[in-house]
Amino acid sequence: MIVRPTGDTAEIVLQVDHAVISGQLAEAWAGENTARDSLIVAARLHDIGWRHWEAEPRLNTDTDQPTNFLNVQIDEHLRLYRLGIEEVAAVDPYAGLLVSMHSAGIYTGRYGTQPALKLTRAPDVQSLVDDFVAEQEARYEAVRDGLDVSQDELWRNYLLLQVFDRLSLRVCLGDPAGPGPMEVVLPEEQTLHIAADGDDQTVAPWPFAVDQLTIEVPTRTIPLTGYANDDALRLALEQAEVEHRTVTLRPVS
């Protein structure tokens, strides 16, 4: 889950809700794509494995605060991604391949498109990470050949999935003060530029098939500290009211 401290409280966005927003971005994306339906499935379900953890979330043992997704133990990360890949592949093999690439890419700087991406404690269990990446990469060619998908097309859709993931994360992580500008690699060696505009975001070049896109982010607000144990955290999440924070994406005026 995404944990955003807000003073003495924390705004929580579930990973599965973040993924649904990624799917909304994919649905609104302009342009022709023969694999559009599979790409939407991949975007909408790319974090589906996290539902197993979010059903029983745990405290960060270093801080006794709710655990942000980047700080979940790496062996647990890998377990969740394996579960998610299997679940998505059972629904749509092409989408499953994209989610496999996405999951491996989390540990490889998104295959060079986001070198700064680092997961807490990943270097401490590098052999587990290396085995996971090798395991996923070993199946790419066979699955791709079975789907009759070219490497160029697969890479293009992988990049688009990263766009939807990163843009959704930016929306979900929202900050009233506005985070700094963000650049995301697009296919055809282009770059998407995103910048805060109050509580909203501007996007250039404008990539969507609508004039502007309004996103409703489901949030839960809970105490940041004061939990006796994991059960207390789970109870707080269960009892928290689901609210919606609105973020509008628009072109640069």
Where are these regions (language model features)?
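Non-catalytic terminal regions of proteins
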Residues: 120-253
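Residue-identity detector for threonine
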Residues: 6-9, 22, 34, 61-63, ...
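Short, surface-exposed loop/strand segments
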Residues: 31-32, 36-37
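Divalent metal-dependent catalytic cores for phosphoryl transfer on phosphate-bearing substrates
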Residues: 2-13, 23-24, 39-174
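An active-site-proximal "capping" alpha-helix that borders the catalytic cofactor pocket
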Residues: 16-30
